[in-house]
Amino acid sequence: VNQLAVQLKTTTNPDMRRYERPHINEVWCGDSSVGPYLKTDDGKKHRVYIIALIDDASRFIVGIDVFFNDNFVNLMSVIKSAVAKYGRPQLFNFDNGRSYKNKQMELLAARIGSVIHYDQPYTPTQKAKIERWFRTMKDQWMAGLDIRDFHSLDELRGNLLAYVQTYNQSPHSSLKGMSPQDRYFSEPNLFHRLSEEQIGHCFLLEIERKVSADSVITIDQTEYEVDCRFAKQRIKLRYSADLKDLFVVEADGTLTPIRLLNKKENAFVKREKVHLCRGEE
């Protein structure tokens, strides 16, 4: 112990304190954890990753899923599912990992009306609840798994979701004997829900592309055709992670669908002539 520091009441220790939000949906904390290895039907072993979101006030798991990759697209699917069920939080609490700290995440949070707080390095108390939950999950769920019983992500997912349901409905020592589920639903006026259409638009990825002279843009090595009025311009695009829905963002913010380039079909399309206005004669 540094006696001089004690006498002078100074310290180099950071001020880290436990905290708890007073109301539900104020803060959702998200994190990823490695799961078990899963041997699929092809005979190969694959590492499984678990992505989860916990409500700070209630310890209720609002979102969770299993994946073979820990990336932003999979994180977004967990957030989308949680928001569809329970509405949006006021704030997301994440670490500085690449899946969590990126432009797409910032755009997503802004669209749904949430803000993001990124933890400072070496401050474990800032996401203590989600890390403690992962430890509990590993002790209670993973430790009892016989991984030979599972041959697909869907099978493992179903087993994990059953465990999460049991956890959410069990009394919690930090909640004075209440279950996370009872605590979470004790404040029904604090659910800020979004419509299905809002969710569909908010959870689109966004990029910019330069349009070619013949009105073509490329995403993931696939060519798409846009309206000829965008030729040679730099445009903003929004698209679903599976690339089933793609849109040009118009100047007024509306979304105009675009389609795959079809060169054979274009060979029979009559081209529009450009008419230049010469004024009244």
Which ranges hold each PLM region?
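Charged alpha-helix within mobile-element recombinases
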Residues: 106-200, 241
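A short acidic/small-residue loop/turn micro-motif
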Residues: 67-71, 263
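Acidic/histidine-rich, metal-coordinating catalytic segments
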Residues: 86-104, 120
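Mobile-element integrase/transposase regions
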Residues: 1-54, 58-61, 72-78, 85-90, ...
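C-terminal, beta-rich DNA-binding module of retroviral/retroelements integrases
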Residues: 168-281
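Hydrophobic alpha-helical segments, especially N-terminal targeting/anchoring helices
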Residues: 54-55, 124, 249
